[in-house]
């Protein structure tokens, strides 16, 4: 479709106008010349809707007979798979082609019909997207929940019985306690210190932990994001190369199956290959179920594709490491390991659970004993089960509550979405398909509707505004269920159960209704002036406008260059609708925040540490930073307390001295216990990493020794 115009004739059954992509004319010329010399032509594009559409376009370009069986497809680029595909050619699936055409035209209609309204309301650089706008809405609504979240104090309570059994508070008055928020109940718990509790239940249960399913596109992207730090687009780019193949000892080998799939199905041949490998490497007892379970709610599965797996399990990551670059090795290792794990036996274990009670207060403990390690032999889940010997405890036994371990904390707002969790959310809502997840995320980032903070999505001001206006004027486009229903209807077109032109007509008719309503509303909206409580040099209130970088204040005199950015200033939609915004105090407060807040920590040179905020949140900086260059990081838990406003202030000064003295004392004890580096003899230092604090040798980079900090 052309880049500069809609390219769809809405008055002629939505007939698309296809153009040759710039620079690809020579490729078409070569294809035509080669086709004249060929005895037989096979169309072997990717085995999905996009691939089917490409095959159809090539067939049209080469003037091939659509009734001829010239379409072949395979899920892996191996000699055997290709030969098998050539033996079983088929006709081009026109229903699948129409499904892909309908998707592209739907996206065009939304983009070209709705975006002009956004240009008028917000800025010429904005645009609407059928699926990306719904993804933006999900991110914005989550941010609203985070902003409106009010932390609640709670207590995590553990009881230490007879000096050795560490049990969690379980129930009070037959109600399960997840987070204890009632201070009266806490006092009631404290009263039972040094009292006897009786074991009212002790039982052993047999448990099974099944291995995870084979990978599909969404779970591949999620795992690559979580474990490797790959973006969705990077994951697909590296996977594409592994699928296309690598030269290994002079032989070209496709290493993985097709990576755009929403199926976790595995072929019988691949299962048998895995069974032979597992029997040889681990023994027959480690063989998994012949027919491992698949998810029942995989409603979005388009076809009979396999999950993502290695083409040959015998090509272990270690065997082919030298032929892969760093990223290829990481991703292949992930895919290979997950496939192996999925075909291994379940882990079997016994769980001993016991409950102690006194006066309707219960504590619960559990310990696990692995009976058969199964897939745990190769891979243990991050949240490992507590493993140990079963204590000799039976019903009727009595234990003394020696000590209470009470930790005060505050409830946390919902976590922002990462690339991994956004893909998971889109999939669970039925929005998008394997081929679109990466492009949805890329579009949001390129349009600057979202930004990444600590690998999590935060909507930008311009993103919020786009979401707000689309929600207001085109609620159907922004409706998650409506978007998911469209995806289902596209699947129906693919299966031949729905006519693609009927689908487009229904959609476009409804879209036009909203457009008509929108035109009049937009004109009224544009006539409105939103004044601020700041008076400009001309004596008139500055007015709010929206530009490339979000909201800003400007003079009512068009020739004036008086502008004030509103970045970081929260303005409610109610204020904007009222035509008057109050931002003067907020701007002053923001300026104060940039200047910093005094703390009670004084350095040896007499300089005071100032609390400041940067790209990664709060940090401490000397008020004489230009002279002494002193800057300190703030531990994550302390940052949270600062954000929740739970650290005391005296005479306008933030009291952090006592907290940091305690941390420094703890760190000194850790370093004393650690001693010198056993490799080079130099002292250790404490560093903060992705998983928390760790010990690192000060001899770095010559000595790269690191150690975990032993828990007390």
Predicted segments, located by residue:
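Short acidic, hydrophobic short linear motifs in intrinsically disordered regions
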Residues: 211-224, 250-258, 413-425
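Intrinsically disordered, low-complexity regulatory segments
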Residues: 1-104, 113, 180-184
């Amino acid at each position: 479709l052309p880049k500069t115009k809609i390219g769809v004739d809405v008055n002629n059954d939505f007939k698309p106008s296809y153009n040759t992509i710039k620079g690809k004319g020579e490729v078409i010329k070569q294809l035509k010349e080669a086709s004249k010399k060929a005895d037989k032509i096979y169309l072997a594009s990717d085995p999905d809707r996009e691939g089917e559409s490409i095959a159809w376009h090539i067939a049209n370009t080469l003037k091939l007979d659509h009734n001829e069986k010239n379409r072949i497809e395979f899920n892996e680029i191996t000699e055997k798979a290709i030969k098998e595909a050539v033996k079983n050619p088929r006709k081009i699936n026109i229903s699948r082609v129409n499904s892909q055409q309908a998707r592209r035209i739907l996206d065009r209609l939304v983009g070209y019909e709705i975006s002009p309204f956004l240009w008028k309301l917000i800025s010429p650089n904005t645009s609407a997207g059928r699926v990306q706008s719904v993804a933006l809405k999900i991110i914005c609504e989550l941010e609203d929940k985070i902003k409106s979240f009010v932390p609640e104090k709670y207590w995590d309570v553990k009881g230490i019985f007879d000096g050795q059994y560490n049990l969690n508070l379980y129930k009070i008055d037959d109600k399960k306690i997840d987070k204890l928020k009632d201070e009266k109940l806490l006092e009631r718990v404290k009263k039972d210190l040094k009292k006897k509790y009786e074991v009212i239940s002790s039982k052993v249960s047999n448990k099974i932990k099944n291995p995870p399913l084979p990978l599909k596109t969404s779970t591949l992207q999620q795992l690559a994001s979580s474990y490797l730090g790959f973006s969705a687009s990077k994951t697909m780019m590296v996977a594409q190369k592994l699928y296309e193949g690598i030269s290994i000892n002079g032989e070209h080998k496709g290493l993985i199956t097709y990576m755009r799939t929403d199926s976790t199905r595995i072929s019988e041949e691949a299962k048998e290959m895995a069974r032979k490998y597992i029997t040889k490497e681990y023994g027959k007892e480690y063989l998994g179920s012949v027919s491992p379970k698949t998810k029942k709610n995989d409603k979005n599965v388009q076809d009979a594709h396999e999950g993502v797996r290695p083409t040959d399990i015998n090509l272990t990551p270690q065997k082919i490491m030298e032929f892969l670059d760093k990223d290829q090795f990481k991703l292949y290792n992930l895919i290979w390991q997950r496939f192996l794990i999925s075909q291994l036996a379940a882990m079997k274990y016994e769980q001993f659970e016991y409950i102690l009670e006194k006066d309707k207060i219960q504590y619960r403990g559990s310990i696990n004993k692995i009976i058969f390690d199964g897939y745990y032999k190769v891979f243990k889940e991050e949240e490992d089960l507590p493993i140990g010997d079963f204590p000799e405890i039976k019903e009727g036994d009595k234990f003394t509550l020696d000590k209470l371990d009470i930790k005060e904390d505050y409830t946390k707002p919902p976590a922002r979405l990462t690339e991994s969790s956004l893909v998971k959310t889109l999939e669970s809502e039925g929005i998008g398909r394997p081929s679109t997840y990466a492009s949805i995320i890329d579009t949001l980032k390129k349009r600057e509707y979202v930004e990444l903070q600590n690998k999590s999505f935060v909507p930008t001001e311009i993103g919020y505004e786009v979401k707000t206006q689309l929600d207001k004027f085109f609620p159907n486009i922004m409706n998650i269920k409506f978007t998911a229903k469209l995806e289902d209807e596209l699947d129906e077109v693919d299966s031949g159960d729905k006519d693609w032109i009927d689908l487009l007509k229904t959609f476009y008719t409804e879209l036009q209704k909203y457009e008509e309503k929108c035109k009049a509303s937009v004109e009224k909206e544009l006539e409105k002036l939103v004044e601020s409580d700041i008076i400009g040099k001309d004596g008139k209130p500055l007015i709010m406008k929206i530009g490339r970088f979000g909201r800003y204040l400007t003079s009512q005199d068009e020739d004036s260059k008086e502008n004030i950015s509103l970045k970081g200033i929260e303005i409610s939609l109610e204020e904007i609708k009222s035509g008057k915004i109050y931002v003067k105090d907020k701007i002053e407060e923001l300026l104060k925040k940039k200047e910093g807040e005094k703390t009670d920590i004084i350095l040896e040179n007499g300089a005071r540490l100032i609390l400041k905020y940067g790209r990664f949140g709060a940090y401490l900086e000397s008020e004489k930073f230009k002279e002494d260059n002193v800057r300190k990081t703030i531990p994550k838990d302390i940052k949270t307390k600062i954000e929740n406003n739970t650290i005391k202030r005296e005479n306008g000064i933030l009291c952090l001295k006592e907290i940091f003295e305690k941390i420094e004392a703890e760190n000194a004890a850790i370093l004393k216990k650690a001693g010198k580096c056993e490799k080079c003899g130099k002292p250790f230092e404490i560093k903060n990493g992705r998983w928390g604090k760790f010990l690192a040798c000060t001899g770095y980079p010559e000595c790269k020794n690191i150690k975990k900090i032993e828990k007390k």
